Amino acid sequence: MKPLFIISCPIDTYSGYGSRSRDLVKAIIELDKYDIKILPQRWGGTPWGFIQDNPEWKFLEKHILPNGQIPRQPEIWAQVTIPNEFQPVGKYNIGFTAGIETTVCNPTWIDGMNRMNLNIVSSKHSKDVFLNAKFEEKNQQTNQIVRHIKLEKPVEVLFEGVDLNIYKLLDKLPQNELFDSINSIPESFAYLYLGHWLQGDIGEDRKNVGLLIKAFYETFKNKKQKPALFLKTSILAGASYVDREEVIKKIKQIKKTVNSKDLPNIYLLHGEFSDIEINEIYNHPKIKAMISLTKGEGFGRPLLEFTQCKKPVITTGWSGHVDFL
């Protein structure tokens, strides 16, 4: 009888953590050493339904626990989430996290990692931040130090990687509606940004989408020859009409802050795309480079995906993505 290995993760979501979860679970299933069961979790407001929409992942369905019920204490328990949510449910417990996008983490994250037997992060940046984190907890009445908080459990880096059967340089370009819509723009040179548009005003959101748009307008305003910028993004983490209108509204708000009527074009790619469609976007001849002004990434999966089509990546030189860029 194989050891029971239960993995709690956002397996069915359209998210970076969802992609990480699917890759991880697939790899463990292929070891054929464990009885793998999946406990699906949500990931913020990101939409569900990835497995249903992508038949090549349907094999995961037979591993999903019915009604979310854990049959017994597993020999191995793993969670793919942020560390403050880690709980030791199994006889041996593993926490998987992309980690941290800054230089300092919350002490509750260290507490969560200390509850596990092993912690696995996506980048050297994340590992270093956790190893260097040290805090003092004080009594609020006496101001006396009641405990020192530091990482006491092992932490290792497991590189996320990409599926080279999907993300690759295409020998033959597709002929479909998506390809034709990108082809229809008048510009011959376009940048691409791919990622969520997180909370905050211009310069405040972590992935810096607002500042990217502002900088793009300011850099190429009044130029005779202007490139385009494609944004594959969402704000409410969905593919709804409401979300699309919210993205368009924010772009227009930023556009109004630029002192010119002669501005470059920004095009929005909105909705749910398959991995194959994303790779087709990467390979489109009008897409010349990926750009991201991100303030920090635990890993930065789209940046790695894009490198496989042999085009330049323009981004900040700090945090998780410098492991591979």
Give the role of each language-model region.
Residues 6-8, 45-129:
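Extended catalytic core of nucleotide-activated donor transferases of GT-like folds
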Residues 274-288, 308:
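Short acidic alpha-helix that forms the nucleotide-activated donor recognition element
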Residues 1-74, 228:
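N-terminal pre-catalytic "stem/leader" segment of glycosyltransferase-like enzymes
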Residues 312-315:
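Short hydrophobic beta-strand element within catalytic cores of glycosyltransferases
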